[in-house]
Amino acid sequence: MQIQCKTLTFTVSSIPCNPKLPFPSSLTLRSWNPSFPSFRSSAVSGPKSSLKLNRFLRNCASTNQELVVDGETGNGSISELQGDAANGSISPVEVEAEVEEVKVDDLATQSIWGQMKEIVMFTGPAAGLWLCGPLMSLIDTAVIGQGSSLELAALGPATVICDYLCYTFMFLSVATSNLVATSLARQDKDEVQHQISILLFIGLACGVTMMVLTRLFGSWALTAFTGVKNADIVPAANKYVQIRGLAWPAVLIGWVAQSASLGMKDSWGPLKALAVASAINGVGDVVLCTFLGYGIAGAAWATMVSQVVAAYMMMDALNKKGYSAFSFCVPSPSELLTIFGLAAPVFITMMSKVLFYTLLVYFATSMGTNIIAAHQVMLQIYTMSTVWGEPLSQTAQSFMPELLFGINRNLPKARVLLKSLVIIGATLGIVVGTIGTAVPWLFPGIFTRDKVVTSEMHKVIIPYFLALSITPSTHSLEGTLLAGRDLRYISLSMTGCLAVAGLLLMLLSNGGFGLRGCWYALVGFQWARFSLSLFRLLSRDGVLYSEDTSRYAEKVKAA
């Protein structure tokens, strides 16, 4: 759709002059360059317009004065056709503007198949970002599993300390993307740099704190987590945790830099950094564990080095965009309040997920070394598979706000877009669920050679598939709730899911259902999230049907 300026002629008449002014004056207007958001970046794309803008004089015009705004060819000028020069009228000021052509590529105007094609193309690079982290853990699991079942079991509680705790700092990622994107929309580069510097400082402070806490209390936390019955796996797990803990500052700073790039609509830079990091981790695991025999310590060193390299590459990518990624700024109390107030609902949501998966590992840990090892393998494959649905949540958060709160608000089109996301999510769930189930069922030797561990893995195949297949659709629904700023509901519903599923997990584990009971509790957790999100979106009071946006307006403004 091409949008161009048209000639506009209007007459200003019968406007009384202000008697307090020393002279009657003409009305001089400033040319207006409309901004139409494209679906990709919600900003005008194309060459920058060069405007010579005159000042807008808020005085009165003389009687029967006609103004013409001419814009036939894209250059606009304002001229005075009739006026009384003897009365001291200000001579017209010519305004020349090179008005750019705005190409509107609106996702909402496409057919449902066209929408799905665009969504798939958009989520490609984003999928890579979500895959690299779980891929590193999966590589560690596969390499360590070939050497020792004891170290494979130790990897379970160790990854809880190293990986799951990282997700509690997801609020840094959300706050960075939101604040950077908002500052860019204002075209204020200094404000963008200030926001990045503040969040880099917060990331550094949190990272150093976690590194110190890991060093001081890592062994105690692992002992309390695994229990007395599994004290034999604590030394190996602690070795892994202490080495990985050295990378805490780099991990959180890297998250801030990655999210800043995403806020600038750049997903390829972070993807390249994480691809290099994954390659370093894979090669390091093979060399240090397989050839040099360092075992779980070698896997930890390979992962730690890869995380530091990834953080440096992401910061370097920011520097190439003209921002200083090595500039840190201490935030004021009001700025801290803004950041944490914005990210609090997401923090609660992520904490609920982390706590439930931590409970899964906790109850599995009490069932013996072989069951811990089997659970570790299945959980790593599950995590690797579920991230394929995360880009659907990101897509909803990118494209839904314009249809829900934008100038061209259109709830029917928003519902059609959600339908496209759910269809893709359901299809992706079946495909990923089938492939993700086939790998541990047909090729368990990739992860372990222990027949007992393999047997325990096969016992949870059915609940594993049921939990995995619904996850992508759940992500698309929750992403829509986040886009609609229905933050209170999503945080409360996730907390409720945690409470009910946690109780079910405890009952099934203590009732003698073993590892299978743990995974059926996960099925209940995932399907409850899907059902509650779907119910809210189909409700007449939900963001897709309610015409009253006053409940969400303040949240959108604050964000």
Swiss-Prot record:
One of its GO terms (cellular component) is chloroplast. It is found in: Plastid, Chloroplast membrane. CDD domains: MATE_DinF_like. The keyword Transport applies. Its main location: plastid. Pfam families: MatE. Constitutively expressed in all green tissues. It is a multi-pass membrane protein. The chain crosses the membrane at residues 119-139, 152-172, 198-218, 245-265, 273-293, 295-315, 336-356, 359-379, 423-443, 460-480, 489-509, 519-539. GO terms for molecular function: antiporter activity; xenobiotic transmembrane transporter activity. Residues 1-60 form a transit peptide. Keywords: Chloroplast, Membrane, Plastid, Transit peptide, Transmembrane, Transmembrane helix, Transport. Belongs to the multi antimicrobial extrusion (MATE) (TC 2.A.66.1) family. This is Protein DETOXIFICATION 46, chloroplastic. It comes from Arabidopsis thaliana (Mouse-ear cress).
